[in-house]
Structure formats: C-alpha cells, structure tokens
Amino acid sequence: MSSLPQYCECGLGECRTDVLPLLYEMSQIATESGDLSSIISILLRLMKRHMKVVRGMVTLYDRDSGSIVLHESFGLSPEEAGKGVYLLGEGIIGRVVETGQSIVVPCIRDEPAFLNRTGSRDRDSDDANLSFICVPILRGRQVMGTISAERLYDNAELLKLDVEVLSILATTTAQAVELYLVENVENVALEAENRRLRSALGERFKPANIIGNSKPMLEVYQLIERVVRTRTTVLILGESGVGKELVAGAIHYNSPAAKGPFVKFNCASLPESVIESELFGHEKGSFTGAIGLRKGRFEEAAGGTIFLDEVGEMSLTTQAKLLRVLQERSFERVGGNTTIHVDLRVIAATNRNLAEMVADGTFAEDLYYRLNVFPITIPPLRERGSDIITLADHFVSRFSREMGIEVNRISTPRLNMLQSYQWPGNVRELENVIERAMLLSEDGVIHGYHLPPSLQAPVVGDSEAPPDGLEARLGAIEYELIVEALKLHHGNMTEAATHLGLTARVLGLRMGKYNLNYKDYR
C-alpha cells in the first residue's frame, strides 16, 4: 500500500484513493476471465462516479478497416454514440491511436483539432470550458484503442493526476481488449458500419426531420409522441406521397426498440406467389428454387419494428397469416413445422379506405381491428397551408448541398403558384418539382418557367389566354419579372422600370394589366 499516498491528493480538492477497490476488481476480472464487457462496465462507473467525468468513451481500433469505433460510453445519447467512428490520425482520438501518446486538451474551445464528432457539445451551456483527456490502450507497442474523458478542471495538478489514473486503467484493460479484438475482428468493423447506419437512419427519421408546423401536422406530432414509448400496433393512413414511411421511422427510432432493426416491406411490390415466403421465410426444398433456408422479414425484424406499407394490397390468404402473427406473435416458415416466436412492433400503412374494403369483403374484419389500434392520419399537402413553402425551402436547401448548385430562393410569384396548386402527388411531387427546377435555374432563383406545365396557372388579367398557350406562358414570365423588380426596389417604379429596361409609363401600363400596385411592395 505504499502507493496509496500518490493518489490521495486531498489538497487538490478531490481524492483518488476511492478508485483503488474498483481498480483491483478490474485487474481480477482481467486475470481470471478477461471479460471485456465487465471490465468496461467498472471502468465507466469509476470515471463517472469517482472522477466526476461528464462524458466517457472507450474506442477500439480495427486495423483491417482502419476504423476507430466507439465501443462503450456514457453521457452520450444513442444518436451521438452512433456518430463515434474515426479514421487513423483524425481528430484527437485518431492522433492518439496513430502516435500511441496521450493527449490532454485543457480547454476544448481553444483546440481546433477537437472534432466534436458526436455533436454532444451542442447540448451544453458551459461545455466550451471542458477539458479533454485521451489515453491509448497499449499492448506492448501496439495501440488497440483509447479511453477518453471530458470534465471541467480548475486545477492543472488534478488534470495531470487524472491522466495518470486513466493510463493505469488503460493498462489494466489492455489484455481484455486484445482478446476481444482477436475473437471479434470481423464484428468490430461491422459494429462501425452499423453505428454509422443507425446514426444516419436515426437522423433521417427523427420527428424534427418531418417538416411542417401547420395545425394538421402538429396534431400528427402529438399522436407520435403519445405512441412512441409503447409497443402498440400503429396504422398510418394517408394518400400516396404524404410521408407515411417518415412517420413510421420516427416512431421506431424514438421508441425503446430504437437499437433494434427497422424492416420495411411494401405489400404491393411483389406477386402473391412470393409474398408469403418474403414475410415468413422458407425452409430448404420447400418449393422449386428454395435451395436453402431463408429468414423472412418478420424474423429479421425481431427485437425491432416491421413496417408493412400498402397493407391494403394484401390478398385474403396473406391477411389471415398476418392476423395470426398479430394475435400470437408466432408463425412457421413456408415448408416448415417449427413455430417461430418474435417480439416486435408492427406498423402498417395504406392509402386505401380499409373500412370500405371490410364492408365489400376484400379486407378481413378481424385484421382491420387488429391493425387499427392506434390510427394516425397524415393530411394531404393541399391541406397543410404554409407547410408548402416551408417544405419547398427545405428541398431547395437540401438539393443545394447535394448537387452543389447555388440556388438561394424561390421567386415571390412562384411561391403563390406553389401554394395554389393542389399537389395530387403530395410531398413527393413537390420534392420532384423542386429538384427539376434546381437543375434548370441559372441565376440562383427558381422562376415560374422552371416549374412544370402542370403548375402553370393563367396570369391575372389574361383570362382569355389558354392556360397552356404561348401567351399565357409569356404573360407568366412577364408578371414574374415585374414583381421581382418591384420587390427588389421596394416599390420604387422609376428604379424598377430602369431595372427592366422600360419607361415608368410603360411599366405602369404593364402593372395595370396584371392588377399590380407598387404600394404593395414598399
């Protein structure tokens, strides 16, 4: 016990003697079983409770893929932890793995190499003053991972002491990490890819990514919030293109089963002869072409959620088998006798009126009531008012990033055009319209002539012209150019006329043709 005083630094305001029992327990596990999970559990508990660490992480280095993967952590949400994948030499963690040397950042705010890859700092009000310690997990001269910690230090000596403590913890952990990497070399790379995919999917399907603040959409958000923490079966109703899959994903990725699979199946995408095999799987030799055992979508979704889109397109035969799964959570593969039990959530969606289908005998009544436990109806885009402009701006911003095209806005007259259109294809149609217009735009603005003919409406004051005729199209362009000039020059007719290459008198005549008033633009 001669080393005890080294860690009893009570003059620093914190004592480190209480880490010794846990350190001893870690070393015993490392010697007797080498169970990495148990060792890391103690390690993280020690950091959190006895070292007052705000966020702690253990990463593992997969030499084959070159990835450094966040293996375990605390202080991070599942979405943040999912982003914890680094390359050799990338950021502080990547540099520690590359050099095998510990790195201490006294103040995160002042260190440009600190990537904040997980995005966790965005939540904290005083996180700019946090310190960051990262030490390598070494076995001989080989780096196998890192241990890192974030916390607020007001004492440089205590910071130095904790670097030493973490280095001892890393040494104690090293043998178990080495064994784990040898036994799970393929799983580490797979874990990195799974984390990346879960993070990407979680971001895509979080409720914040369902665009819209109209009253009908606020009601949808309230229903999602009500059902998200349960395992209740959900039936999502709405026209094609309204975003039923986004709502299903938002429910799954914010539920207790978020770490489980989210399996999607379109019931209208395959012929009746193969749907049963796709959903429930099949045994080897169960039919011509069944050359091996295959798991179905329900087995793949075990522990998570299965999303059955276009459920109204199922045949009555398949409906009967789906009803059994909903009632008993069990089924048999095609050609098999073994009953398979699954624990999962079912979310179904349709653009059909299932109640009418029940009445005319094309949809099973029992199945309808099993699915219709918690219905969520997504309104069509034409009923969402201001959401049309919000969505259009969102798509402009997204496609600008994805395509590398500099488009700043949609012209004012065309915003009116977007709002007056009925959008039979809903959000999907709007997305396609904006993507097309982005490709056609040349001056950073989406004009009316960039939109498809189906959106072109007759111009005010030109009701005699056919809506698809040349005069109407030219009038639409002229109307838009005048409105843009008036808006740009805040209703100053002289400046607007100069901008358009007209006299103020001619501009006034053209404005009269379209019932435009310069005062509306001041």
Swiss-Prot record:
SUPFAM superfamilies from the UniProt entry: GAF domain-like (SSF55781), Homeodomain-like (SSF46689), P-loop containing nucleoside triphosphate hydrolases (SSF52540)
Q: What does this protein do?
A: Required for the expression of the V-dependent nitrogen fixation system in Azotobacter vinelandii. It is required for the regulation of nitrogenase 2 transcription. Interacts with sigma-54.
PANTHER family with a match to the protein in the record? TRANSCRIPTIONAL REGULATORY PROTEIN (PTHR32071)
The UniProt keyword set, sorted, is:
Activator, ATP-binding, DNA-binding, Nitrogen fixation, Nucleotide-binding, Transcription, Transcription regulation, Two-component regulatory system
Q: Where does ATP bind?
A: 238-245, 301-310
**Keyword S-adenosyl-L-methionine listed:** no
Give me the positions annotated for DNA binding.
493-512
Q: Which InterPro entries match?
A: AAA+_ATPase, GAF, GAF-like_dom_sf, Homeodomain-like_sf, HTH_Fis, P-loop_NTPase, Sigma_54_int, Sigma_54_int_dom_ATP-bd_1
Renumbered to this chain, region (A domain) spans 22-183
Q: What GO terms in the biological process aspect are recorded for it? A: nitrogen fixation; phosphorelay signal transduction system; regulation of DNA-templated transcription
* Domain GAF stretches: 35-177
What species is given as this protein's source?
Azotobacter vinelandii
Which parts of the sequence belong to the Sigma-54 factor interaction domain? 210-439
The molecular function terms in GO held by this entry are: ATP binding; ATP hydrolysis activity; identical protein binding; sequence-specific DNA binding
Report the protein name in the record: Nitrogen fixation protein VnfA
